[in-house]
Swiss-Prot record:
Subunit structure and binding partners: Homodimer.
Gene name of this polypeptide: pyrC
Gene Ontology BP annotations: 'de novo' pyrimidine nucleobase biosynthetic process; 'de novo' UMP biosynthetic process
Described purpose of this protein according to its UniProt entry: Catalyzes the reversible cyclization of carbamoyl aspartate to dihydroorotate.
Protein name stated in the entry: Dihydroorotase
């Protein structure tokens, strides 16, 4: 890393949690990510979900076709864990270059209706993953209607994650997009096979952002933004230098008319300015010197992959993202649309 008061050069980062959708929208969102990141973990929650090595390989080719010419970018593919994903698919997936499977509790978030209804139904597949070295990526929320929305992550740790870890002590688990002090503390105290990703929006905002001046649907995501005490705990974890925490945007594009709706979709689109938003969060915390580890070093180490060899440079320079991007036949409104950002990617 090299830095001055107004510029910062770091090893090219990776995004360890990304949604790019499919079809025509790929042509908008993939270039945004490829401009900043060397690699990205691609979420499998399409309709239908990506549940086979063959589907993952085909999806990867569609993503690569949307990467601008001359840009080096590698999508890292995942499978969607279901109650009946066969264990023998894991070996095929590993041989095809798939790196992980994603656990969505059924009903927890966008396109999660095919998700897991009972973790015990997946145990044979998880055993195969532990043996093959595939990672388990976890959306860590319970979905019981009697559990308060803001408590679902903390309850998941006690009811699901602790027993899961006890059964599979050497399965590498990424607790994705953590949002609470309880999650940060759990990961900090867990063994070397547990890590977590943190989004830029959960570092920058608490739940007040959803309600400032009225309902602001573009700040609505799952897991939902939490109290300020939780945001502060996430900032402390991200800027601590611990290799258990690394960058995962959870950038989740939706057509604007489905966000700005009576029952709007969950998800914040941040890929257009992701590394700039992380720089802002780390700068706010007085920890720009910790950004490279979080963005470029800890993730590859946990996944057992080499670091990227290139660099990116950020400059302290105010700029304003556009109000929207084309998204197939719809419009995509990014987080911070029309609002000034203090850091800009320049190389």
């Amino acid at each position: 890393m090299t830095a001055t008061t107004d510029t910062l050069t770091i090893t090219r980062p990776d995004d360890w949690h990304l949604h790019v959708r499919d079809g025509e929208p790929l042509r908008t969102v993939v270039p945004h990510t490829a401009a900043q990141f060397g690699r990205a973990i691609i979420m499998p929650n399409l309709r239908p979900p990506v549940t086979t090595a063959q589907q993952a390989a085909e999806y990867k080719q569609r993503i690569l076709a949307a990467v601008p010419e001359g840009v080096a970018f590698e999508p890292l593919m995942t499978l969607y864990l279901t109650d009946n994903l066969p264990p023998d698919e894991i070996a095929r997936a590993r041989d095809a270059g798939v790196v992980a499977a994603k656990l969505y509790p059924a009903g927890a978030t966008t396109n999660s209706d095919a998700g897991v209804t009972d973790l015990r139904k997946t145990y044979k597949t998880l055993e195969a993953m532990q043996k093959a070295g595939l990672l388990l990526l976890v959306h860590g929320e319970v979905t019981s209607s009697d559990i308060d929305l803001f408590d679902r992550e903390a309850v998941f740790i006690e009811q699901q994650l602790i027993p899961l870890r006890r059964h599979f002590p050497e399965l590498k688990i990424v607790f994705e997009h953590i949002t609470t002090k309880e999650a940060a503390q759990y990961v900090k105290e867990a063994g070397r096979f547990t890590a977590a990703t943190i989004t830029a929006h959960h570092l920058l905002y608490n739940r007040n952002a959803i309600f400032t001046g009225g309902i602001r649907p573009h700040y609505y995501c799952l897991p939902v933004l939490k109290r300020e005490v939780h945001r502060q705990a996430l900032v402390q974890a991200a800027t601590s230098g611990s290799d258990k925490f690394f960058l995962g945007t959870d950038s989740a594009p939706h057509p604007a008319h489905l966000k700005e709706h009576a029952t709007g979709c969950a998800g914040c689109y941040t890929a257009h300015a992701a590394i700039e938003m992380y720089a802002e969060a780390f700068d706010n915390a007085g920890a720009l010197d910790k950004l490279e580890g979080f963005a470029s070093v800890h993730g590859p180490a946990f996944y057992g992959l080499p670091r990227n060899t290139g660099t990116v440079t950020l400059r302290r320079e105010s700029w304003t993202p556009p109000d929207s991007f084309a998204f197939g036949e719809a419009a995509l409104k990014p987080l911070r649309a029309g609002e000034a950002l203090p850091w800009r990617l320049v190389a």
